[in-house]
Amino acid sequence: MDMESWKLLRSVCVLSFLLGSCFVYQSLRVVDAQEDPKPAVTLQVDASNGGGRPIPETLFGIFFEEINHAGAGGLWAELVSNRGFEAGGQNTPSNIWPWSIVGDHSSIYVATDRSSCFERNKIALRMDVLCDSKGCPSGGVGVYNPGYWGMNIEEGKKYKVALYVRSTGDIDLSVSLTSSNGSRTLASEKIIASASDVSKWIKKEVLLEAKATDPSARLQLTTTKKGSIWIDQVSAMPVDTHKGHGFRNDLFQMMADIKPRFIRFPGGCFVEGEWLSNAFRWKETVGPWEERPGHFGDVWKYWTDDGLGHFEFFQMAEDIGAAPIWVFNNGISHNDEVETASIMPFVQEALDGIEFARGDANSTWGSVRAKMGRQEPFELKYVAIGNEDCGKTYYRGNYIVFYDAIKKAYPDIKIISNCDGSSHPLDHPADYYDYHIYTSASNLFSMYHQFDRTSRKGPKAFVSEYAVTGKDAGTGSLLASLAEAAFLIGLEKNSDIVEMASYAPLFVNTNDRRWNPDAIVFNSSHLYGTPSYWVQRFFAESSGATLLTSTLKGNSTSLVASAISWKNNGKDYIRIKAVNFGANSENMQVLVTGLDPNVMRVSGSKKTVLTSTNVMDENSFSQPEKVVPHESLLELAEEDMTVVLPPHSFSSFDLLKESAKIRMPISDSSSHQKTTTV
């Protein structure tokens, strides 16, 4: 074969190879296209300037109720339980639980009596030490308090212990933080005083610095000096509470990360009580902590010293940047009611409570606030008259008396009725009506449309309590959270009538689970968020954003989706949120119209997905991040894109927009025209 023939043959072979490769490549592309089915649904989003409406600034917030030891033994950082010995009742001698003795009955005798110097809490503890330095155990005898299922003491941290004491003789009292059985001392200081110094009640304080860590520690008060000592109002607080305001840092931060726009407090059924004698009464929760009598919350069956009181709730709201919504008792409990003709003392109590928050420092109740260290008024624009009381005999009559009195004194305050106005108009005036829903996952998912047909006239809706409960919920399942996410998307779409919404309950101490499920789970030293908590985080940017007009087209009955636009650090985003409630993966086309071409940026766009391998998966102390959102780069951020929604998932897609680049002519001294990009 000559050289020319060889070159020709080689060229033919190369050409054949290239043609064959192209054919194979095209065939593979066809196969890929066939294996990647067309999207089952399309979300059409109108992002033009006129394509949306504002979402209320207040839409998503939180509801704090004293339930599950959410406050006492939780958010409120006080380590001592039953610090004033009042929990056992006013008849003495009384039960001092959870206090107990160090030593035995041959060396120490303790009992309560009514000798306290505080008029509202007369119970004190008398400790008769029967041994002396020779006969007492080396560590002394006395009493200890284990706190709320153990005190979390951390090495290097400081704890302020305060107590009131008196005695008939000299005292030499050791104040110690120890391990749960008292065998190891974590920190200790002495209070030494002469008989003349402690012949009358006197406040003593010590600062303890822990030299070791123990999440199940206890506080001990011990002595080897024979004689009688009276003790009252014992407090142990970490020095490093949030802003020094008494809130446990890690729990406060979990709450703050939701970015709530309001906080409803202090209940709930906690406000009502099983009986009015045990209802939360705000006046008993203000002033110096040692003067607060505390009370037994008979609905949730535990004692609170009320260190977390009326003042602290307003402080919490301010610290978290949320509008306070105060729920007060309207003369009605679960089992007894005050008739309307006799309701005025309760009305005056509500007016006084508003004055405490908003009044001038020279006003009657504003001055009480000022004495607590707060000269400036708190902000208070919302109050709720009762909780879940609409069907009670005297509610409507009582409500009108409260409404008229509050509007006369504070016409700007927005008033929330307990009666549901979503299906029928209210028969009384209100700015908002309260709506509560606890149900199964499938029911709540279907309630995505709950407010679609609600009249836009009259009061706005406040969905102040909602959650999936029952077997679908477990103790905080993925399934429950997905139904809640769909429900919230529905509230977001109906935010022209729904102005506020909050999940319930917020906190649970695992040692006293009175309600199930809850958003944030904790014990003395650890915490985690349930999937329902993480759903709340998806909606943090919705309040005050713009709801974009969107339409979901397709055959799927398991998908719910919406779109908002919002700003962060001066940048514009479109956020697509989608719930796939079904067991199969779904492809969803997202078609955004009304934007300039090529406005989306891949860099800065992201997707966030909440899902797991099993729809009933939960988080736990051993696996706190088993079901949490996972964030990644959104590589195909375009006006027309297809996204994959995993089975049983909640996804958000944040599309970063940038200003369109326009070519503008400019001129210089030359005769040629130049362009610049702006």
Swiss-Prot record:
Supply one GO molecular-function term.
Answer: xylan 1,4-beta-xylosidase activity
Keyword set, alphabetical order:
Extracellular matrix, Glycoprotein, Hydrolase, Secreted, Signal
What cellular component GO annotations does this protein have? apoplast; plant-type vacuole; secretory vesicle
**Pfam families in UniProt:** Alpha-L-AF_C, ASD1_dom
Tell me, according to the record, the phenotype of the null mutant.
Answer: No visible phenotype; even in asd1 and asd2 double mutant.
Q: What induces it?
A: Not induced by hormones or during leaf senescence.
Q: What is this protein called?
A: Alpha-L-arabinofuranosidase 1
* Organism of provenance: Arabidopsis thaliana (Mouse-ear cress)
Source organism lineage? Eukaryota, Viridiplantae, Streptophyta, Embryophyta, Tracheophyta
